[in-house]
């Protein structure tokens, strides 16, 4: 009688066979795997920081791609695969693979060990134009503050933008030889191309060079002694632009709207450059008074008071 076979004996008698998968992998996967595993510079026995330093030293060493292969060369990885061309690893690819290995070890790009900056540092000292408070021209900023009323700076800035736009779109001015502009000014045809320089030339040309100061009681009989004094550039520009605003406010309005005031100021600036504005008369009057009273600079009363000019 044959011996009985139980289920356990039947399972033990089975033989399990497994077929090995074909070793066909992509070239990129083989190169990356061989680089990360068999790289001589990344040994698992060393700490990650030491491995990274060794990789950086090897990348800085010069080598020739013609005579000897570069480090981390993977030409032998695909030697057993028939029909595949040899893989040449450039220095850029080697650096990229080393960065991948550093990321695999947990080293970040912003680590202290990696020198340099991503975008570079600017040269010091920084120019004043890069400051957000001084990004505009000095003359434009000064004239905007003089245009401001009741602390409404945004309205003054809008008016200044309209003034510059009017100067930019206006035709070239016709200069008057009897009232010359400031020395070194650009030609009349170039002024509309740069409205900021247009405004600067108009203000500096009509700005007075001196001011009259009165000293009470020094002229005798309770009369004040008028003495001419030079003034700095900022005060000269402030006086000239205030004269322009006074002339604009005295002229009749041509209509209502928030753009009319800016247009009248721009028209007066063009009139100043062309020599048609009455601001030139104020400048000539101040200079005539200074010429007439220049003898008061040597007055004995001023010398006794200790005033020197």
Swiss-Prot record:
Record's GO cellular component terms: mitochondrial small ribosomal subunit; ribosome
Single GO MF descriptor: mRNA binding
One Pfam short name: Ribosomal_S7
Highest taxon of source: Eukaryota
Main location class: mitochondrion
GO biological process: ribosomal small subunit assembly; translation
Compositional bias segments (type: Low complexity): 51-61
Region entry Disordered, spans: 39-86
Gene3D superfamilies attached to this UniProt entry: Ribosomal protein S7 domain
Protein localization: Mitochondrion
Swiss-Prot/TrEMBL keywords: Mitochondrion, Ribonucleoprotein, Ribosomal protein
Function: Component of the mitochondrial ribosome (mitoribosome), a dedicated translation machinery responsible for the synthesis of mitochondrial genome-encoded proteins, including at least some of the essential transmembrane subunits of the mitochondrial respiratory chain. The mitoribosomes are attached to the mitochondrial inner membrane and translation products are cotranslationally integrated into the membrane.
Subunit-level organization: Component of the mitochondrial small ribosomal subunit (mt-SSU). Mature N.crassa 74S mitochondrial ribosomes consist of a small (37S) and a large (54S) subunit. The 37S small subunit contains a 16S ribosomal RNA (16S mt-rRNA) and 32 different proteins. The 54S large subunit contains a 23S rRNA (23S mt-rRNA) and 42 different proteins.
Family according to the record: Belongs to the universal ribosomal protein uS7 family.
Protein name listed in UniProt: Small ribosomal subunit protein uS7m
Organism listed in the record: Neurospora crassa (strain ATCC 24698 / 74-OR23-1A / CBS 708.71 / DSM 1257 / FGSC 987)
Lineage: Eukaryota, Fungi, Dikarya, Ascomycota, Pezizomycotina
